[in-house]
């Protein structure tokens, strides 16, 4: 329990002879008493010894009774932590200026004037303001700052931080600006008062709206910094953002010329980044306030802003270099795209360390600070230029949702179900924009649902749908996402790479179909997710993985954050949405290394900046991005392939699989190198014993294990059949070394014909002539049957004459037998009573 007592310290000297105790008068409520002796007093600290303890408290009358003359400059607050059984404990001391005892009311206009000039500031928008009887003062009476711990590093000499080289200068007061430059409002344009769109054209062109709401609707608020370590701040509030999970929290408050970003992590100490105009000074609450006021830690003020960084994370979580970097963020640029570009870069690099959670802590703080600063930069840019753009609002909303998920899941190690984010920005109303978007999607005529628009338009529509989604996606948005993924899948069957627009469209389509939080009981959404995972895994062939990794390496090698924006959607790959975890195996890393010379610019950069071992390490980390993104997201796995977790099976949870292939509902193929504990198990022959491949067919209802026999037959040729005989089956190509190369779902009759064409196939994985003798293939049927793919029987053209009549009848008989065999494999091959026949639907 805690007890609080206020007494007066007579300065400059306290002696035993002139001790003064304050006793409640009869007029005041009886609150008990405490006696304390001041044993030592020095220029640096005070020490108190507890001689007696009784329950105590304080009220307004008692506090007012302490209001002495002007010669008494300070009062002290005694905070006692006492064991309720032994009445023994520790005593702490906090010094408060005496003027706090007199309520002081902040004088300000109810409405702030619009700033004068392009980058004008309001007159003193951020002002230190405190009153002992103000509700915001309560945190200072309950804080542990200076009692149980100190929020700042113990040595004030280290509070002054150097200004980073990237911080703003007098010649460059607003930092860098990316290309293309921010559009300006055309002459004679009448600006809307708020962001909205009534047609899809609003996404294709620049739509401007006024920033006047940021001034007319701003409210005066009080902010109490971290642990009450700095006196309260009044500011004109223009918005807030809250990102939370079970292991991390980022709270951002934005105002006119003001930002507070409180970043906390369950495994680390919290920090707070505060930005004020360069003319504003904040005062820290320290034990030295008797003699002089200290500014909180931070660099010298810049040409526009002053930055402070609070928290013991200053000297415990970070290196000095990292601390200086974070303090520079708000002054590096007022272009929000710059900060988001840096956040994406850090997030991508963080995924290469996803198996080493203790290393992600610093990345977590950096990304969180970048996210907060991007909101501040957009708010300030809009305020000072007096306008915003609709695409800026959509862009920021999608970035908040996506980066929050990556930040919390990979940076903080949070459970995905606990991740949430809310934004309340005065210059945009996501709820209103969501309703307008729903109306637009609702105007799509059913006859046009299957019509596929350009990838540019699809990307813009899906990006907006993802950004403004509130847990429920419009049925036509889901339909568009499905069509985009299927179209890209068909294209990747005959090529190895995607252009930037296709990658962006694929990113937003997959995010919509895979990452939903509401309606988990909706079987159609789960089916969408299973189909998406299967298609993404099928697109992630060995050849595509190599090209996608080269795209990422080029994106990072050529990264110039002062010119162009870098985002993860720009380098997105189906491998990042696949369920493959094997791409860090040596053969895939070596394939990437051998392909680097095919891109001369990248090859030159890598060999100029890195030695051979560093190049190999960079290649390995690039491939690790693919294995980390979706394949290790337990939320996605639990939602869409729950059968791999039944029967207390921890293999998937521990990542003990090479890949997962969803089959019919409730069943999946799992490929592993470990000994399976359940399921129908097939061991691929002629594979290196040190790198075995086991194909396991899992059912949600079966916990037993049984060995299956791989069929070795020539399959019937499907050319003369209208129906798709092999649709739903999966083609798997592997090497005798045990490496998995390609996984392709047979999705249509055209794909089936390409599979049967063998040496004439235009789909490279299907063509055996394009691979060596060490390449093998099997076909995985949806009912759990596995067949070695040797070839397809062709029925020859037969002349209808008596000489060949017998041969014709014999051929027909063989065809019937062949189709009977394949039908048995598709629907009737159940080796265990626990594995029932599964309809091919």
Curated annotation (Swiss-Prot):
Q: Which GO terms describe its cellular component?
A: host cell endosome membrane; host cell plasma membrane; membrane; viral envelope; virion membrane
Describe, as the record does, how this protein assembles with itself and its partners.
Interacts with glycoprotein L (gL); this interaction is necessary for the correct processing and cell surface expression of gH. The heterodimer gH/gL seems to interact with gB trimers during fusion.
Q: Does the keyword Transmembrane apply?
A: yes
- Briefly state the protein's biological role: The heterodimer glycoprotein H-glycoprotein L is required for the fusion of viral and plasma membranes leading to virus entry into the host cell. Following initial binding to host receptor, membrane fusion is mediated by the fusion machinery composed of gB and the heterodimer gH/gL. May also be involved in the fusion between the virion envelope and the outer nuclear membrane during virion morphogenesis.
Ranges facing Intravirion side: 824-841
Q: Which InterPro entries match?
A: Herpes_gH, Herpes_glycoH_C, Herpes_glycoH_C_sf
Q: What is its main location?
A: virion
Task: Spell out the residue ranges making up region: Interaction with gL.
Answer: 246-309
Name its GO BP terms in alphabetical order.
Answer: fusion of virus membrane with host plasma membrane; symbiont entry into host cell
Q: What is this protein identified as?
A: Envelope glycoprotein H
């Amino acid at each position: 329990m805690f007890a609080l007592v206020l007494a007066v310290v007579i300065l400059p000297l306290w002696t035993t002879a002139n001790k003064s105790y304050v006793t409640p008068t009869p007029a005041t409520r009886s609150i008990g008493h405490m006696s304390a002796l001041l044993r030592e007093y020095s220029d640096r600290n005070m020490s108190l010894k507890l001689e007696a303890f009784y329950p105590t408290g304080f009220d307004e009358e008692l506090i007012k009774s302490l209001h002495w003359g002007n010669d008494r400059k300070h009062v002290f607050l005694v905070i006692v932590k006492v064991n309720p059984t032994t009445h023994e404990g520790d005593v702490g001391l906090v010094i408060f200026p005496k003027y706090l005892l007199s309520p002081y009311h902040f004088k300000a206009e109810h409405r702030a004037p619009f700033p004068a000039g392009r980058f004008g500031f309001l007159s003193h928008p951020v002002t230190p303001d405190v009153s002992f009887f103000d509700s915001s003062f309560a945190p200072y009476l309950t804080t542990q700052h200076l009692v149980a711990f100190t929020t700042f590093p113990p040595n004030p000499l280290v509070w002054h931080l150097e200004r980073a080289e990237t911080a703003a200068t007098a010649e460059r007061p607003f930092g860098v600006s990316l290309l293309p430059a921010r559009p300006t409002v055309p002459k004679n344009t009448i600006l809307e008062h708020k962001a909205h769109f009534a047609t899809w054209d609003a996404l294709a062109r620049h739509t401007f709206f006024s920033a006047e709401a940021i001034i007319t609707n701003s409210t005066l608020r009080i902010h109490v910094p971290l642990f009450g370590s700095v006196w309260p701040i009044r500011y004109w509030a223009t918005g807030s953002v809250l990102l939370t999970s079970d292991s991390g929290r980022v709270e951002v408050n934005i105002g006119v010329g003001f930002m507070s970003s409180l970043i906390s992590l369950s495994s680390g100490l919290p920090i707070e980044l505060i930005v004020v105009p360069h003319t504003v000074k904040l005062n820290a609450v320290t034990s030295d306030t008797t003699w002089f006021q200290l500014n909180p830690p931070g660099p010298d003020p810049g040409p526009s802003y002053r930055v402070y960084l609070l928290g013991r994370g200053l000297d415990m979580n970070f290196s000095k270099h990292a601390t200086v970097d974070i303090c520079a963020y708000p002054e590096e640029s007022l272009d929000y795209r710059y900060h988001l570009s840096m956040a994406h870069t850090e997030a991508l690099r963080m995924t290469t360390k996803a198996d080493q959670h203790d290393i992600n802590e610093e990345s977590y703080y950096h990304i969180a600070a970048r996210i907060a600063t991007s909101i501040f930069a957009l708010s300030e840019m809009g305020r000072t230029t007096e306008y915003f753009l609709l695409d800026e609002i959509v862009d920021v909303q999608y970035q908040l949702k996506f980066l929050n998920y990556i930040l919390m899941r990979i940076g903080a190690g949070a459970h995905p179900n606990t991740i949430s984010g809310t934004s309340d920005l005065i210059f945009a109303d996501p709820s209103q924009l969501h309703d307008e978007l729903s109306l637009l999607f609702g105007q799509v005529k059913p006859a046009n649902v299957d019509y596929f628009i350009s990838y540019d338009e699809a990307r813009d529509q899906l990006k907006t749908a993802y950004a403004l989604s509130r847990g429920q996606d419009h049925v036509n948005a889901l339909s568009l996402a499905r069509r985009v993924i299927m179209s890209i899948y068909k294209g990747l069957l005959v090529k190895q790479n995607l252009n930037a627009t296709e990658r962006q469209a694929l990113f937003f389509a997959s995010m919509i179909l895979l990452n939903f939080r509401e309606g988990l009981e909706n079987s159609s959404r789960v089916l969408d997710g299973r189909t998406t995972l299967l298609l993404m895994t099928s697109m992630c062939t060995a050849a595509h993985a190599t090209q996608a990794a080269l795209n990422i390496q080029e994106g990072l090698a050529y990264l110039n954050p002062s010119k162009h924006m870098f985002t993860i959607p720009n380098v997105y790959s189906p491998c990042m949405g696949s369920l493959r975890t094997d791409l860090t195996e040596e053969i895939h890393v070596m394939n990437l290394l051998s392909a680097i010379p095919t891109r001369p610019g990248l090859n030159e950069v890598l060999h100029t900046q890195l030695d051979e071992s560093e190049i190999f390490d960079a290649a390995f980390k690039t491939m690790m991005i693919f294995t980390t993104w979706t394949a290790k997201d337990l939320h996605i796995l639990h939602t869409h392939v729950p059968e791999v977790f039944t029967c207390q099976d921890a293999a998937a949870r521990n990542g003990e699989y090479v890949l997962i292939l969803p089959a019919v509902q409730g069943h999946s193929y799992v490929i592993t190198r470990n000994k399976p504990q359940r399921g129908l198990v097939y061991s691929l022959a002629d594979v290196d014993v040190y790198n075995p491949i086991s194909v396991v067919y899992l059912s949600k209802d079966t916990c037993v294990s049984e060995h299956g026999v791989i069929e070795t037959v020539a399959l019937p040729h499907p050319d003369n059949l209208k129906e798709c005989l092999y649709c739903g089956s999966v083609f798997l190509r592997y090497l005798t070394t045990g490496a998995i190369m390609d996984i392709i779902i047979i999705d249509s009759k055209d794909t089936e014909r390409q599979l049967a064409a063998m040496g004439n196939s235009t789909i490279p994985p299907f063509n055996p002539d394009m691979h060596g003798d060490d390449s093998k293939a099997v076909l995985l049927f949806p009912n759990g049957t596995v067949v070695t793919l040797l070839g397809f029987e062709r029925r020859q053209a037969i002349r209808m004459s008596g000489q060949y009549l017998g041969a014709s009848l014999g051929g027909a008989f063989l065809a019937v037998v062949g189709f009977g065999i394949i039908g048995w494999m598709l629907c009737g091959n159940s080796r265990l009573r626990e594995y029932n026949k599964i309809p091919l639907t």
